Amino acid sequence: MPEEVHHGEEEVETFAFQAEIAQLMSLIINTFYSNKEIFLRELISNASDALDKIRYESLTDPSKLDSGKELKIDIIPNPQERTLTLVDTGIGMTKADLVNNLGTIAKSGTKAFMEALQAGADISMIGQFGVGFYSAYLVAEKVVVITKHNDDEQYAWESSAGGSFTVRADHGEPIGRGTKVILHLKEDQTEYLEERRVKEVVKKHSQFIGYPITLYLEKEREKEISDDEAEEEKGEKEEEDKDDEEKPKIEDVGSDEEDDSGKDKKKKTKKIKEKYIDQEELNKTKPIWTRNPDDITQEEYGEFYKSLTNDWEDHLAVKHFSVEGQLEFRALLFIPRRAPFDLFENKKKKNNIKLYVRRVFIMDSCDELIPEYLNFIRGVVDSEDLPLNISREMLQQSKILKVIRKNIVKKCLELFSELAEDKENYKKFYEAFSKNLKLGIHEDSTNRRRLSELLRYHTSQSGDEMTSLSEYVSRMKETQKSIYYITGESKEQVANSAFVERVRKRGFEVVYMTEPIDEYCVQQLKEFDGKSLVSVTKEGLELPEDEEEKKKMEESKAKFENLCKLMKEILDKKVEKVTISNRLVSSPCCIVTSTYGWTANMERIMKAQALRDNSTMGYMMAKKHLEINPDHPIVETLRQKAEADKNDKAVKDLVVLLFETALLSSGFSLEDPQTHSNRIYRMIKLGLGIDEDEVTAEEPSAAVPDEIPPLEGDEDASRMEEVD
């Protein structure tokens, strides 16, 4: 039975908190939590729920609003009293509601929340278990709740969390209808009385609540009055505060006089400081995602985007949609104009899509809501079906969320396709986010085809403009069965590469892929529109040939068979095989990689990885093939020399030099560049007619040994033998 205390006519009843609630409050008060600010979110969310209820009731019975038409939430900090007050004009509580809801009947979530807390859950989840009110004790030592329901008198609930609370009829200032929560803040929590802090917390957690949240602040302003009024005001103040030691001072900020001898002299004026109450609405940005897209202007979208992201520029594109049926949610998605500098920083928490459930903010870093490759998309998702008490663990298992995610990805791809029709804007988008699209091709097998339609590349025929793979296919020759591409560091480098010589000469278009991520992209993108993607830097390049060309190729293979064998013997393990090339025109030779090995570009990328796996590098790098150009005079002369004497040291020397030069021109790096340089210098001396013996006689220290170790050795295979 509650204990009754009589104070004159006022009856105060004391109740004990239900055991689980007392335990929860003890946990909240005695444990340190860093994000105490969530108490404000919870109290505002409760106020919003109460306003939702009265609004719903008023739909069937408009007279419910006779006790107050305006639906709003007010926040009133009072530094003198050290109180923070929240007032709403919601449905209010009856005495029975007060006793039951705030203390004697445990909500089903109380125990679950305590178990979650002890298991390491975050305090910010408190509202999701229906016990958000008690988060007030994170910052308050005492809480007073004054409430008025249409069906009952005005009551006051009060507790300092000592295991009990009191309820009494309240004969103070009538509040009409609704609830007033007065927090008597702890000494170390006065930051929540500061204008800046309150605004910051409301903006972070509650800026999209569907009712106006107004902050009431006592401020000072200067007022200009005449001397007579100043004297009167001063007199009044002195009378009011005559018992006070410190009397208010009227600040004289100067007087305006006219030195006119006329009778109409201007009255002397003084400036005094007066106090006034400033009212500022904190959530002017209403949840526009709940409105009809046809009624929203681009300016409104722009303002909303800026308030959501703190970006100073407008968005590039927007997609506003709702899904109805078995599942109901609304979403508003934006593409920014530029990529953030930390777009691919793994450790950084991305707060790009805010998740709301029925207009109440749940979280802003929900990985399950959008795949990583779309992490640049900003926006809001508001679900009608997710429970408010959703936790991160539950989200990971949520089937509803999986459906929402699928829809978001689909709508994002629609948005990209729409944007692609506007060449100018798509160019800006592609410059900023092409890496994301390529990452999507690598990761998202379901949407790979749609993503591949969004890719744009420079090609051997596109000039300064970029072209899509669809446009490439539309320009393909009748005999062409594949899409030819080359990967490299820059457009200039790949355009001048030996690999594209024959392909371009035959009139086939080559796609230039110059971003490191392209290497990963083409590993997954094997074909486009039924046409396979073929690298011109890998073995097995097949160009459409007529009978004459086939015959010529067979003759060349037979003619150069012995040279190929000899070159393979000289280079030994450096190459897997030496063959006749069908891709060279003006270059004597090139290095190609096996179909499944790394390209030169990929090898360069992998070597640059700080945490590379050396075991993988060993077998992926080993597959190099040397292709020689049968029509090149260097190769023809080398064949003749080899036919004459296959043990000629000069032949061996030239083969190694050709191989190393081909490595460089094909985009690979040399393991021992110094030896290669020495070999080149020696060639220069020969060309200039400088006698090697003279140099060695003058500088014995720089003498070259008579016999350089043989080329066949694993370690020293790249060293050059002395030229006779």
Curated annotation (Swiss-Prot):
Sites marked Cleaved under oxidative stress: I126, G127
Residues recorded with modification Phosphoserine: S226, S255, S261, S307, S445, S669, S718
Entries under PANTHER family matching the protein: HEAT SHOCK PROTEIN 90 FAMILY MEMBER
Assembly: Monomer. Homodimer. Forms a complex with CDK6 and CDC37. Interacts with UNC45A; binding to UNC45A involves 2 UNC45A monomers per HSP90AB1 dimer. Interacts with CHORDC1. Interacts with DNAJC7. Interacts with FKBP4. May interact with NWD1. Interacts with SGTA. Interacts with HSF1 in an ATP-dependent manner. Interacts with MET; the interaction suppresses MET kinase activity. Interacts with ERBB2 in an ATP-dependent manner; the interaction suppresses ERBB2 kinase activity. Interacts with HIF1A, KEAP1 and RHOBTB2. Interacts with STUB1 and SMAD3. Interacts with XPO1 and AHSA1. Interacts with BIRC2.
Ranges spanned by the short sequence motif TPR repeat-binding, renumbered to the chain: 720-724
Sample GO molecular function, one term: ATP-dependent protein folding chaperone
Modified residues (N6-acetyllysine): K435, K481, K624
Domain of life assignment: Eukaryota
Gene expressing this chain: HSP90AB1
Chief subcellular location: cytoplasm
Region span, Interaction with BIRC2: 1-214
N6-methylated lysine PTM sites in chain numbering: K531, K574
Residues that carry a glycan: S434, S452
The species this protein was found in: Bos taurus
Keyword Nucleus belongs to the record: yes
Protein name (database record): Heat shock protein HSP 90-beta
CDD domains assigned: HATPase_Hsp90-like
One record GO biological process: protein stabilization
Location of region: Interaction with NR1D1: 620-723
